[in-house]
Amino acid sequence: MSRPRFNPRGTFPLQRPRAPNPPGMRPPGPFVRPGSMGLPRFYPAGRARGIPHRFPGHGSYQNMGPQRMNVQVTQHRTDPRLTKEKLDFPEAQQKKGKPHGSRWDDESHITPPVEVKQSSVTQVTEQSPKVQSRYTKESASSILASFGLSNEDLEELSRYPDEQLTPENMPLILRDIRMRKMSRRLPNLPSHSRNKETLSNETVSSNVIDYGHASKYGYTEDPLEVRIYDPEIPTDEVKNEFQPQQSISATVSTPNVICNSVFPGGDMFRQMDFPGESSSQSFFPVESGTKMSGLHISGQSVLEPVKSISQSISQTVSQTTSQSLNPPSMNQVPFTFELDAVLRQQERISQKSVISSADAHGGPTESKKDYQSEADLPIRSPFGIVKASWLPKFTQAGAQKMKRLPTPSMMNDYYAASPRIFPHLCSLCNVECSHLKDWIQHQNTSTHIESCRQLRQQYPDWNPEILPSRRNESNRKENETPRRRSHSPSPRHSRRSSSGHRIRRSRSPVRYIYRPRSRSPRICHRFISKYRSRSRSRSRSRSPYRSRNLLRRSPKSYRSASPERTSRKSVRSDRKKALEDGGQRSVHGTEVTKQKHTETVDKGLSPAQKPKLASGTKPSAKSLSSVKSDSHLGAYSAHKSENLEDDTLPEGKQESGKSALAQRKPQKDQSLSSNSILLVSELPEDGFTEEDIRKAFLPFGKISDVLLVPCRNEAYLEMELRKAVTSIMKYIETMPLVIKGKSVKVCVPGKKKPQNKEMKKKPSDIKKSSASALKKETDASKTMETVSSSSSAKSGQIKSSTVKVNKCAGKSAGSVKSVVTVAAKGKASIKTAKSGKKSLEAKKSGNIKNKDSNKPVTVPANSEIKASSEDKATGKSAEESPSGTLEATEKEPVNKESEEMSVVFISNLPNKGYSTEEIYNLAKPFGALKDILVLSSHKKAYIEINKKSADSMVKFYTCFPISMDGNQLSISMAPEHVDLKDEEALFTTLIQENDPEANIDKIYNRFVHLDNLPEDGLQCVLCVGHQFGKVDRYMFMSNKNKVILQLESPESALSMYNFLKQNPQNIGEHVLTCTLSPKTDSEVQRKNDLELGKGSTFSPDLKNSPVDESEVQTAADSSSVKPSEVEEETTSNIGTETSVHQEELGKEEPKQALCESDFAIQTLELEAQGAEVSIEIPLVASTPANIELFSENIDESALNQQMYTSDFEKEEAEVTNPETELAVSDSVFIEERNIKGIIEDSPSETEDIFSGIVQPMVDAIAEVDKHETVSEVLPSACNVTQAPGSYIEDEKVVSKKDIAEKVILDEKEEDEFNVKETRMDLQVKTEKAEKNEAIIFKEKLEKIIAAIREKPIESSVIKADPTKGLDQTSKPDETGKSSVLTVSNVYSSKSSIKATVVSSPKAKSTPSKTESHSTFPKPVLREQIKADKKVSAKEFGLLKNTRSGLAESNSKSKPTQIGVNRGCSGRISALQCKDSKVDYKDITKQSQETETKPPIMKRDDSNNKALALQNTKNSKSTTDRSSKSKEEPLFTFNLDEFVTVDEVIEEVNPSQAKQNPLKGKRKEALKISPSPELNLKKKKGKTSVPHSVEGELSFVTLDEIGEEEDATVQALVTVDEVIDEEELNMEEMVKNSNSLLTLDELIDQDDCIPHSGPKDVTVLSMAEEQDLQQERLVTVDEIGEVEESADITFATLNAKRDKRDSIGFISSQMPEDPSTLVTVDEIQDDSSDFHLMTLDEVTEEDENSLADFNNLKEELNFVTVDEVGDEEDGDNDSKVELARGKIEHHTDKKGNRKRRAVDPKKSKLDSFSQVGPGSETVTQKDLKTMPERHLAAKTPMKRVRLGKSSPSQKVAEPTKGEEAFQMSEGVDDAELKDSEPDEKRRKTQDSSVGKSMTSDVPGDLDFLVPKAGFFCPICSLFYSGEKAMANHCKSTRHKQNTEKFMAKQRKEKEQNETEERSSR
């Protein structure tokens, strides 16, 4: 029978029992259901149906008839009865029950019991009346048979105590007996099933049966029976039952029909008829069965068959045969539900958690739903009846309803309720799970999910989304069509529920615990309690129960719905558990219930309300309990299913549940909860999870519960301890709490004020305090602050505004400004502006210290500045994390409090899977973090925290080790010297750890800092780094999005830096920012300073007063910072970046230049002395951001300056000597640049200011004139002053410039935005006014020049020295260069100022650009470079000017010279910028060489500053050439030679200078101040080499540029210089036909200042550009010669044009550049000499050129050096000749040609164009350097285009004179950018080629710039790859073209030479 019965089941889809039970039938039936266990088996088989079946199963055995009917209804019963056919179906179905029972005994163990159960379910329904009447022996045997037992088993039954043998417990006992019997027969199966049931029985078998019935009936009265029943039956039954139930449930639907077919309709009808009789007759059996069904209906043996049958019936037969059964089953089902509920509840009570959890989750919910849907009234009444009479309530309809619901075990498994006993057999999948982990994994398997889906399909009437209460609801609404409604929602809900529960359990053990409890035991208890109340009420009346159900349904809030809730509430034990689980939701609902108690908890609970409840109104324990209990019945089951249900998403429900938990606990411990609940608001809008909240708060203590309110981005958090809340609140006061990268607000629900706000306020207060401290410290500058406050309204330049900015964590410029208030602060602030908010704040703290210590702190300020520079790198990350900013701000007060901070070192972090927040959380409990640095690349982290906190943290984690992602963290104290701001120090420490032998001192120049990396951008950056060489090491700071790469060589680092500067790389949306190690610059500066100290008389003075230096630094920083502040503020308006760069130029320049302190001293001294010389007011005045303010506050600024100047004055008193004046000159230069911006911004005001300052400046200049050296330097200063004045008026400019410089410093920041427009106006306005002054100043300059002539070496050295006294701080290699640069910078600064004024818009963009390119050193470096340029140009040019006649050449050539100087300085600045970017490596090398060469440079400076530059490039060649002649040494260095040629040509022949587009521009500039410019260029190149070595690639760039122009684009430095100066000249040259030079300059400036480039581009032709490029491509010598020939030709042409066409124009500018004019005179003299020298060198020293080229090769390491050398031996000679000819002869003609050649070449590949002359040179050099050059060239082109795109357009439009004018503007800008001249010089030289190209084709620049590749200017071919280019260079075609080109160049050189000679 069992098999036949099983076979019918086998037909059922869900008949799992077959598989699990070898007997086949036995597993389904006997699993648990035949016996006491049999019922459980049934409910698994058909959860809904199984429950009813089980009840009938018990009754059916008592009344066989009903059973048969049920059997007929359910084929499973039919099978058992078929096996028991001996009994007539009509025969007392009791008999059938008995025979059945006997058969069940044998087969029931196998499967019949299941079928019997199924039949018995209907029978039970039928039997219920019988039970009511009486039961006979037959009925007893039928009952036994229904449980798969025989009479023999009664003996075992007699062993049970009498008190347990109650009708309610009997099904449980019988199931237990049967399970034991089955376990004996089927040891494997029973043990398996039994274990399973043990695990899931609670949840599955007994729970399922009782679950559904008990939950519906709310029976809690049979706990004892339940206990008895649960122990054995549930386990086996559950296991067996689950499988059979699933299979049965699936099969039952079909078998029901089959059963009907198998059994005569009569049988079924008999059974259906009998049910009433059998039910009444076999009251006990029915009762027992009912009880079992009540308990087991969800899954007991007797009920199992019924379940299967009922399932099938409910699915198929239920409507067919069950239609008749349905009404009875409806009646009986309620009864069976009651009985089952009672029995199960008792069993559960006995089993307690096991059954109760299973039943609560699965059965009760299911039963309730079914019952509610199908037989609400019967169920309700059955409760009363269940207790009073079982039969009447169990109708066939009830049975069908039961059948319509899966068994509780199935439901439990469906809901993924965690079984209480393991191993657990999944009733849906027949898979055994030995552990909870296995069960959780199984829940997530596709098999289980599919089984759940099939279960929903199998029970269409069962809506898994509707919990019992909802079932009632659905019953009311869908009594008629429960299947559809429940069916459609069921899949969704079930999925949600199953997934939700699984997730929950997996998410949090607490939830998990709650869930299982709530699911099985708790639900059972809840249901029991509910059912008790319900049963009571139901017994009272069915309708009330229904009404309750209806109430529950409609409101969906069981809690508020009925008095049962109250009674349930009274039953607290269950409800407390439910409270903990389901109550979580009720917590949401608790408030809701409070607010809307009548509303359904789920519906009523809104996320917002939930949090309100949780946070604000914590319901009393009673209200919570009531709500929870109410919600418990439905809500807890709802917690399972309702969470899945429509009311709330699982997440929301979970949240609600969590909140409920949180509230429950608070309710339990109201005082505790009230104090232990936190409201977390302002959570991330992009989503957050409970885990995120827990992670953030876990460090403070255990978290009892979390309630999420996503709609409001809030969460309620309950901590177990009040102390945790207190510690959290305290922590929040000091540090923001960050969740997923966002600071959140945390407050106690009663307290709405989030503490984060307080925290924010505190940081703001801190900022305020710091701001106030700054203000206090700068009390003298308070007036300025006030003034600047008015101006700060415009640009936020005022410190107060800065403070505000800082408060906002907003504007780096603002913070920089505030920092600027203090000199050291200024520096730090500048860097801070760069770095970002965090670095700014960090700098602030440093600045505060600086304020406290003011000037003495200057040196510390420098260190701080270094830190800030590091911070810059990390600034972005800091900005990214506002907490970091707050921390930084807080650091200041902490520092003020002098709290000892320690660094905690954390190592062994996991590779991935952790966030910075998690590391923060490690330290949060111990105190506020000051800073954190996570080195994800090294799996390490550093946390800066209060020392006490650090100690306790280390001790705690030592005692209680913590692991992260399986890695046990090692937490210890870091060494005391560790500074998180000094990232390089940390990096070097790590390097030493890995490689103790590593030479850390020489490793910094190999560091490349990359900022703004995406989180996953490390690999991309490493790939980028590997393109420039091997990346030896790297350190990735994930929390700062920064990485430091250590490349294999400084050249690689420099190349990468230059490339990334020119071609910013994007990784996703992140634009990488690249910087070099600030220590490299400082080291170079120190070396240069040492050299300067040796060679310069002034440097010793500076060094003699180190205190003064620091003071000077402080004063100079404050003053220079102030101008930069102004610039920065103005720039901040333009762009914070630009302003930051400008400030950094002024402030960071010192920092980089000489550890910031040295260079800062130089700058400070320069500024301070400049302030003295020109009047202290200017510097201070410059501090006020606005010109207006400045003019208004000149007095105030003077006072402020006095404050700052107090230091300055000290220095000045000490440095009263010429050196001081030199320093003043430098400061003037700096100020000039600022003035340029200011003048440009507000010309009229500036003029007034200038006029006000002119006198003092003139006086100062006069004083300077008194000292030759000083006069030289001062002329530089005067020149600088006049440089703007030259545009305006040289003389006025001189005095005004000093004033204007200071004013401009202030104005520049403020007006830099307006600088461009204003510059034009100022130029126009001031040119006139300053012409007179310019003339006077020219005379002075001429005198100075004469003095220089007399003491060229001395003054050069002296100049270099004083400048370096000042510059020493800035750069070591600048010792010679610095002086040259100082003077040249003065000139170039003046020129730059002029250029700036002339092309105000361009100049503005140029300085900002240049500054942006070379952030730190540009302003000062520009000034120095300009000074050097001018000094070199002066000294070298003065020599030449002396030769050519300074006065005449000055007066005549001054316009041209001014343009040239501008161009040169501009070029230099541009080139320096470019070169610093591109050729930092070369610069470094050269700088090192220069360090050794400074004396030579000094000599060369005395001989020729160009020579000094040459010395910078090649000390040997420089020495030889310097001994030969000033010009020869220039030629001795190939680049120098080129520069010399260009400069000489330009100096000698403005027209020649014009001829050479690249160097022609320089030449034009040189014509304006040709020799000085060219010399400056060369010297700049030379100096720029050391300078860049020092940290400013700009100085080294000239030589390097010369060298690397061939080798790399950096050769363009000269071009850049020329371009910078010639951008001014460009405008002039545009007006004049000499714009070719301008083109170069513009191109170079375009690199530096894009606007000028387009103009030049327009002028230069591609052919000329190509020619120039070809020349340059050859080698440094070739390039130098060729460029000189070409450039000189162009320069000569342009210079001539400038002189001719632009002289008038320039003459107007000449007043601006009186010093420049002097420089021009000097340059011209020098250019004459130098040019003569160049010609001599060219003619005499092609060999020298080759030697120079060889030297260049050595320095540049060009592969083509040999080839180039060979070619240059012949080609260079020819080139030299060509250069001479070009310089002399090919002015206009060749100028055009070369412009064409150079321009295309330049635009495409500056570096390549350099190689162009010699294919070998191109191949070797360019192979090495072309990538850099090309990139640099293109990048400069980009810059040209970008910065000067509009000017480039203008270039085409304006006349050549206009171009020259614009060029002069660009030059000024470039000069302003001279801080970056090294890079830009090289770039400019290279980019001058590129720029000439750019000039010719402004549009091409854009295209060429973004596109990487190599362009052969000689062949006009473009190659995308370096190899292709190299191959091309080696090709015969290229060689032939090169030869042709060289031949042309030779001719041009000859022509140029002739022209130059004639021009001389």
Curated annotation (Swiss-Prot):
Residues 19-31 have a biased composition (Pro residues). Residues 676-751, 902-976 form the RRM domain. The modification Asymmetric dimethylarginine is found at residues 47, 49, 54. Residues 76-89, 468-483, 565-583, 591-602, 755-782, 838-854, 867-879, 888-899, 1082-1092, 1140-1151, 1484-1503, 1518-1527, 1772-1790, 1819-1831, 1870-1885, 1936-1960 have a biased composition (Basic and acidic residues). Residues 470-573 are annotated as: Involved in localization to nuclear speckles. Keywords: Activator, DNA-binding, Isopeptide bond, Metal-binding, Methylation, Nucleus, Phosphoprotein, Repeat, Repressor, Transcription, Transcription regulation, Ubl conjugation, Zinc, Zinc-finger. Residues 484-556 have a biased composition (Basic residues). GO terms for molecular function: DNA binding; RNA binding; zinc ion binding. Disulfide bonds: none annotated. The keyword Protease does not apply. A zinc finger (Matrin-type) spans 1876-1906. Residues 618-628, 783-802, 1399-1409 have a biased composition (Low complexity). SMART domains: RRM (SM00360), ZnF_C2H2 (SM00355), ZnF_U1 (SM00451). Residues 60-75, 117-137, 1442-1459, 1806-1818, 1886-1895 have a biased composition (Polar residues). There is a cross-link at residues 291, 775, 1804 (Glycyl lysine isopeptide (Lys-Gly) (interchain with G-Cter in SUMO2)). One of its GO terms (biological process) is RNA splicing. GO terms for cellular component: nuclear speck. The modification Phosphoserine is found at residues 128, 288, 298, 367, 381, 418, 554, 606, 615, 637, 1099, 1400, 1635, 1661, 1864. InterPro entries: Matrin/U1-C_Znf_C2H2, Matrin/U1-like-C_Znf_C2H2, Nucleotide-bd_a/b_plait_sf, RBD_domain_sf, RRM_dom, ZNF638_RRM1/2, Znf_C2H2_jaz, Znf_C2H2_sf. It is found in: Nucleus speckle. Residues 1-137, 352-373, 463-673, 749-804, 827-899, 1082-1151, 1396-1420, 1442-1462, 1484-1527, 1550-1583, 1763-1898, 1930-1960 are annotated as: Disordered. Its main location: nucleus. Interacts with FHL2. Interacts with CEBPA, CEBPD and CEBPG. Interacts with MPHOSPH8 and TASOR components of the HUSH complex; leading to recruitment of the HUSH complex. Interacts with SETDB1. Interacts with HDAC1. Interacts with HDAC4. The matrin-type zinc finger domain is required for localization to nuclear speckles. Transcription factor that binds to cytidine clusters in double-stranded DNA. Plays a key role in the silencing of unintegrated retroviral DNA: some part of the retroviral DNA formed immediately after infection remains unintegrated in the host genome and is transcriptionally repressed. Mediates transcriptional repression of unintegrated viral DNA by specifically binding to the cytidine clusters of retroviral DNA and mediating the recruitment of chromatin silencers, such as the HUSH complex, SETDB1 and the histone deacetylases HDAC1 and HDAC4. This is Zinc finger protein 638. The lineage of its organism: Eukaryota, Metazoa, Chordata, Craniata, Vertebrata.
